[in-house]
Amino acid sequence: MIISASTDYRAAAERKLPPFLFHYADGGAYAEHTLRRNVADLSNIELRQRVLKNMSELDLSTELFGEKMSMPVGLAPVGLTGMYARRGEVQAAKAAAAKGIPFTLSTVSVCPIEEVAPAIDRPMWFQLYVLKDRGFMRNALERAKAAGCSTLVFTVDMPVPGARYRDAHSGMSGPNGPLRRVLQAMTHPQWAWDVGVMGKPHDLGNISAYRGNPTGLADYIGWLGANFDPSISWKDLEWIRDFWDGPMVIKGILDPEDARDAVTFGADGIIVSNHGGRQLDGVLSSARALPAIADAVKGELKILADSGIRTGLDVVRMLALGADTVLLGRAFIYALAVAGQAGVSNLLDLIEKEMRVAMVLTGAKSIAEITSDLLVKER
């Protein structure tokens, strides 16, 4: 298959991956209305085309939390990334570092912190959930700090797992899940050899290091699910703020009041996110939630956004809506599944190319010039 656009990777990934893995990344919660709206609402954002502005020189670079970035894009934390390519977290991190942008390692990564951090020449970010096992949280924070992780991404929109019905249909969970996954792997021999055989171990590295024994897929569904903490409040985050001396970003903000609470708490940034439509179906898309949040807290902390971003044009739209930086999730997972590190590198090049086209045709010569002035106002 010819890859000519950033969106081409999805179809290629569906052909290459066993269904349980493709649908785990591709699916959302309940009937997946929010999942679809994330993409549709962003696609419906109209930009003002400007001409004759001498756009011969563009500057896509930016800076976030003291880190220089070649463009305002990072890779979001995605669980089980190492199941989509051999040692997938390492490959994705290398692609991000080569591009000069941050990579965020998930709590539930296959490759542990200690494997990924030394593989790249810039500090990575680390994502953490609030879990009942506070000992694990402290252990993970200590290891992230020791490995030189620069920014902590704290996910707060998962006090309980979302109802992801597609996982049960695909074999990721549900009746006879293990048998169905084996049968699917047998019909996808390229993945079975490259990842299933050569990509071992398939345990959850960060959790295994704490528990002292391998933590496989069944434990991911079991131990982690049992450890999500619905009693979480802002007060529970105070000890983490005291312990972590680097930038701290709160992921999962959709309401201006929560954004203001994050400012009061002392967060360095927030991520406007609905978990890619994987938690509560029916909530606002990130594109619709972002403008009100930007109006409430812009300038008081950094605003990042994810969910629904598939192209460089989408990046420009999110920046115009008020984001300082965006994070890619599914988009890079599809590319990783298709071609590993090279796939992610090519995706990022395509994203940059698409951004450049959008900036030239809207008259924005730098990231600072991508503002709400680029948006078509409702008449």
Curated annotation (Swiss-Prot):
CDD domains found in the cross-reference section: alpha_hydroxyacid_oxid_FMN
Binding, FMN: 106, 127, 155, 251, 306-330
Keyword Flavoprotein: yes
InterPro entries from the UniProt entry: Aldolase_TIM, Alpha-hydoxy_acid_DH_FMN, FMN-dep_DH, FMN_HAD, FMN_hydac_DH_AS, LldD
Subcellular location: Cell inner membrane
Entry superkingdom: Bacteria
Enzyme class: oxidoreductase
Bilayer disposition of the protein: Peripheral membrane protein
Name used for this protein in its record: L-lactate dehydrogenase
Annotated organism of origin: Ectopseudomonas mendocina (strain ymp) (Pseudomonas mendocina)
Name of the coding gene: lldD
